Amino acid sequence: MSLLTEVETPTRNGWECKCSDSSDPLVVAASIIGILHLILWILDRLFFKCIYRRLKYGLKRGPSTEGVPESMREEYRQEQQSAVDVDDGHFVNIELE
């Protein structure tokens, strides 16, 4: 017999559920874990775009520019942009046989 067995019995007022050993610590722990899992799953589905975008892009920020003069910030931006700007002649086509 399982610890999580539920028995439904008809009564005068309708159907009621009598759980065997509902005060067992294992049943209580399983119920708490189940409820927490459900809450976390619902939050994940509601906020998955925010959460995963934060994890994907939030940790890839550039170095802090606090205390750096504006001229050096602009020079850094230009270096970063020139590293990104590559014309099509620099790409190599690789053909697999």
UniProtKB/Swiss-Prot annotation:
Coiled-coil ranges per UniProt: none
Residues recorded as bearing Phosphoserine in the entry: S64, S82
Subcellular location(s) of the protein: Virion membrane; Host apical cell membrane
Residues anchoring lipid (S-palmitoyl cysteine): C50
Site, as annotated: Essential for channel activity, possibly by being protonated during channel activation, and by forming the channel gate and the selective filter: H37
GO BP, sorted A to Z: protein complex oligomerization; symbiont genome entry into host cell via pore formation in plasma membrane; symbiont-mediated suppression of host autophagy
Membrane topology per record: Single-pass type III membrane protein
Notes on activation and inhibition: The M2 protein from most influenza A strains is inhibited by amantadine and rimantadine, resulting in viral uncoating incapacity. Emergence of amantadine-resistant variants is usually rapid.
Residue segments, region Disordered: 60-83
Keywords recorded for this protein, A-Z: Disulfide bond, Host cell membrane, Host membrane, Host-virus interaction, Hydrogen ion transport, Inhibition of host autophagy by virus, Ion channel, Ion transport, Lipoprotein, Membrane, Palmitate, Phosphoprotein, Signal-anchor, Transmembrane, Transmembrane helix, Transport, Viral ion channel, Virion
Sequence ranges on the Virion surface membrane side: 1-22
Membrane-crossing residue ranges in chain numbering: 23-43
A Gene Ontology term for the protein's cellular component: membrane
Intravirion side: 44-97
Protein family (similarity comment): Belongs to the influenza viruses matrix protein M2 family.
Subunit architecture: Homotetramer; composed of two disulfide-linked dimers held together by non-covalent interactions. May interact with matrix protein 1.
Function: Forms a proton-selective ion channel that is necessary for the efficient release of the viral genome during virus entry. After attaching to the cell surface, the virion enters the cell by endocytosis. Acidification of the endosome triggers M2 ion channel activity.
UniProt miscellaneous comment: When the channel is activated, one or more imidazole moieties of His-37 probably become bi-protonated.
Domain note: Cytoplasmic tail plays an important role in virion assembly and morphogenesis.
UniProt protein name: Matrix protein 2
